């Protein structure tokens, strides 16, 4: 039961990556446009602001589409059904909530009762995905043949969404109250504690690939900001981009991603055995550069998480502390994708105490270096380059790596489902005993996580390219 639940949570996390992938362009447009830089003409700034706002204002619908595609192997019919489902469900909700809640009208202070936000999108996407997987091959009488098969899916999704809209009108008001209370607590009443917990838990979930789920309420839901033309923004990311002076509380990520972990990589390099230092130096500095520029940290984290888990526990705690430190020092900056140098520079228009980031970051980097160096030496932790025997294979092309992955996983007949997020392949296999984890690591995987018949292989930013090559090979029956 636990393995099935874990597998489903991984699918949700994987599905969330598609809508999240649109955030960089939306965030950059909104961030630059709303900053009103003097070198950019006013008309261009307005276009950028409106373009970015259009994405953030439609995030629930985008999430509905992403969830539907994630659970139906990217079938376009499920995406259409998700749009239909979300539209019908929200309109049904707007009519039935005043009836079931004994309210003649929804006033300004109660408008949250009608706003299901990202969660509403996830529900609509789940409905359409379930309907698709259940009915996409349905047969109907000949006189209704036009509506059989895939054409039946949007119709059924719409009808089911009316029922869900009525059900939600009863259960959503108390849920909405809880979400509103949590949102106000996290965004305004005690953000220091809220984001400290967020940071630690978010890092703790990374090994399991579930951190994308945990990110959603903090990044997309908490807080509310109305700009000068009446547009409403939810979540720390969108509120910061739109100019909300109370947002930007995700800034702690810059401290441990751009400074802390790169210094940890430096410590592991310095602790490597002399004969391995050259090889480890290249690996660690590549991971450090990736973390600094893009904020993608898995290549560094998975280099020590399995061989020295105590270091990861320390890292998760330090990552969590970075957020309240930034909040207490009133350091604010925005992120659209991950906390890297690109985000840091491009989205600096609405920042506060910008100059403090490198100072605090350098302090944090030295702290990381000292703790990692001490722990590795004191307890003889087998971080990269300190193993008794170590195998490094020559770097291969993406296509060669993809073919080897298929072979190591037991062949294409053993692969049931394949997907990828930013840094890892997410695969479901028929027989997990056919998977050779050691060979995957020798192939260059930073980490391999197995749960039931599910396996995650961390290849860093090349994961999606490898997934594409595997898809191409598996779809070509002549190979």
From Swiss-Prot:
As for subcellular location, the record says: Cell inner membrane
The species is: Buchnera aphidicola subsp. Baizongia pistaciae (strain Bp)
What positions constitute the catalytic site?
421
Kindly list the residue ranges recorded as spanning the membrane. Answer: 15-35, 51-71, 80-100, 112-132, 152-172, 252-272, 280-300, 305-325, 356-376
List, alphabetically, the Pfam families matched. PTS_EIIB, PTS_EIIC
- Residues that bear Phosphocysteine: 421
Q: Which UniProt keywords apply?
A: Cell inner membrane, Cell membrane, Kinase, Membrane, Phosphoprotein, Phosphotransferase system, Sugar transport, Transferase, Transmembrane, Transmembrane helix, Transport
Q: Does the keyword Cell membrane apply?
A: yes
Write down what this protein is called. Answer: PTS system glucose-specific EIICB component
Domain comment, in the record's words?
A: The EIIB domain is phosphorylated by phospho-EIIA on a cysteinyl or histidyl residue, depending on the transported sugar. Then, it transfers the phosphoryl group to the sugar substrate concomitantly with the sugar uptake processed by the EIIC domain.
**Gene behind this chain?**
ptsG
Task: List cellular component terms (GO).
Answer: plasma membrane
């Amino acid at each position: 039961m636990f393995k099935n639940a874990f597998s489903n949570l991984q699918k949700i996390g994987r599905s969330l990556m598609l809508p999240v992938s649109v955030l960089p362009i939306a965030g950059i447009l909104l961030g630059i446009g709303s900053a009103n830089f003097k070198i950019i003409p006013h008309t261009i700034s307005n276009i950028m602001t409106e373009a970015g706002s259009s994405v953030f204002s439609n995030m629930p619908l985008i999430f509905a589409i992403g969830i539907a595609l994630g659970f139906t192997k990217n079938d376009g019919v499920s995406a259409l059904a998700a749009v239909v489902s979300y539209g019908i469900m929200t309109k049904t909700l707007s009519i039935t909530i005043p009836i079931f809640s004994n309210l003649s009208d929804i006033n300004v202070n109660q408008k949250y009762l009608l706003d299901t936000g990202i969660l509403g999108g996830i529900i609509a996407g789940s409905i359409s995905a379930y309907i698709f997987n259940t009915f996409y091959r349905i047969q109907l009488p000949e006189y209704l043949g036009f509506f059989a098969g895939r054409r039946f899916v949007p119709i059924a999704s719409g009808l089911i969404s009316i029922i869900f809209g009525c059900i939600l009108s009863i259960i959503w008001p108390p849920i909405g109250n809880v979400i509103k209370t949590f949102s106000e607590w996290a965004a305004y009443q005690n953000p220091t504690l809220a984001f400290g917990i967020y940071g630690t838990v978010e890092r703790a979930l990374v090994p399991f690939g579930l951190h994308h789920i945990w990110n959603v309420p903090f990044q997309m839901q908490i807080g509310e900001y109305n700009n000068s033309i009446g547009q409403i923004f939810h979540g720390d990311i969108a509120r910061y981009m739109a100019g909300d002076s109370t947002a930007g509380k995700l800034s702690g990520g810059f401290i441990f991603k751009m400074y802390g972990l790169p210094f940890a990589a430096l410590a592991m390099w310095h602790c490597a055995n002399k004969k391995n230092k050259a090889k480890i130096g290249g690996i660690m500095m590549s991971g450090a550069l990736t973390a600094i520029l893009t904020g993608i940290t898995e290549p560094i984290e998975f280099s020590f998480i399995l061989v020295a888990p105590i270091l990861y526990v320390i890292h998760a705690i330090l990552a969590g502390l970075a957020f309240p430190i930034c909040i207490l020092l009133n350091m604010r900056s925005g992120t659209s994708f991950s906390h890297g140098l690109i985000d840091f520079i491009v989205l600096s228009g609405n920042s506060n105490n910008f100059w403090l980031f490198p100072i605090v970051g350098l302090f944090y980097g030295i702290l990381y270096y000292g703790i990692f160096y001490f722990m590795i030496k004191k307890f003889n932790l087998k971080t990269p380059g300190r193993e008794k025997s170590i195998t490094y294979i020559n770097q291969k092309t993406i296509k060669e790596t993809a073919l080897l992955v298929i072979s190591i996983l037991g062949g294409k007949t053993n692969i049931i489902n394949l997907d990828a997020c930013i840094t890892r392949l997410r695969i479901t296999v028929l027989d997990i005993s056919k998977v050779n984890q050691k060979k995957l690591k020798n192939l260059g995987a930073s980490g391999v996580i197995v749960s039931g018949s599910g396996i995650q292989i961390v290849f860093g930013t090349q994961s999606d390219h490898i997934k594409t090559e595997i898809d191409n090979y598996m779809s070509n029956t002549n190979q």
